[in-house]
């Protein structure tokens, strides 16, 4: 189990923000990948001494898992906020897909998705990482399925397909955009594909 701030031993107070340190580590791993990130890379990015690093995190793998969990939690929360931002379920789903297009184009697109990059680098072969990535996609599918079902109940979305099947298709398309962004796909192309998806599915 990962340690939390409340589980820390009593003693000298920590002189850095644990959550901010994990977020800095996430940026380092995101840019370099797990295997190409060295301890000096992490210490520089997190602005920690070696002693503080080992006391707080134990090892490189531990901080990587915490960074990946932070990333997946952020991603789910951001999608949830977009899906709740419009009273129309159909419009909310399109807004979420447009957000994926924004993240998948330009410099953000070339940088890629930390979750997708991690899956490509580390899987198969690491059950802990597989579980985090699998739970990310499941949580995203749950959010989209609930929004689709709401749209079906309101008559905005066709009832001819199961909401979870549609949600799986949406998430697959969204992650595909993240991959295409790595090779420089244009935002206008992605928006045309989103319009086609909306026309076919809804």
Feature annotation, model-predicted:
Residues 29, 38-39, 50, 60, ...:
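Amphipathic alpha-helical segments enriched in hydrophobic/aromatic and basic residues
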Residues 92-93, 107-128:
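Amphipathic alpha-helical segments used for helix-helix packing
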Residues 103, 150, 170-187, 200-202:
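Amphipathic C-terminal alpha-helical segment
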Residues 76, 91, 127-153, 165:
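Amphipathic alpha-helical packing segments from all-alpha helical-bundle domains
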Residues 66, 80-111, 163-170:
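Hydrophobic alpha-helical connector segments
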Residues 21, 25, 42, 53, ...:
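Hydrophobic packing within well-folded, soluble alpha/beta domains
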Residues 1-32, 37-48, 62:
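Basic, helix-initiating cap at the start of DNA-binding domains
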Residues 47-57:
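Short hydrophobic/aromatic patch on the recognition helix
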């Amino acid at each position: 189990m990962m340690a939390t701030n409340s589980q820390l031993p009593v003693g000298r107070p920590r002189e850095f923000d644990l959550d901010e340190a994990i977020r800095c580590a996430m940026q380092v791993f995101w840019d370099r990948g797990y295997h190409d990130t060295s301890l000096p890379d992490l210490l520089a990015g997190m602005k920690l001494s070696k002693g503080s690093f080992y006391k707080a995190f134990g090892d490189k793998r531990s901080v990587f898992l915490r960074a990946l969990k932070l990333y997946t939690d952020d991603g789910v929360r951001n999608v949830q906020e977009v899906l709740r931002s419009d009273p129309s379920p159909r419009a909310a789903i399109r807004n979420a897909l447009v957000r994926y297009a924004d993240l998948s184009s330009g410099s953000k697109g070339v940088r890629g998705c930390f979750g997708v990059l991690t899956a490509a680098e580390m899987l198969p072969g690491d059950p802990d990482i597989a579980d985090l990535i699998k739970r990310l996609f499941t949580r995203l599918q749950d959010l989209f399925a609930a929004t689709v079902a709401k749209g079906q109940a309101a008559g905005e979305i066709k009832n001819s397909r199961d909401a979870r099947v549609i949600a799986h298709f949406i998430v697959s398309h969204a992650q595909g955009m993240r991959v295409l962004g790595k090779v420089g796909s244009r935002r206008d192309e992605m928006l045309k594909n989103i319009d086609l998806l909306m026309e076919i599915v809804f």
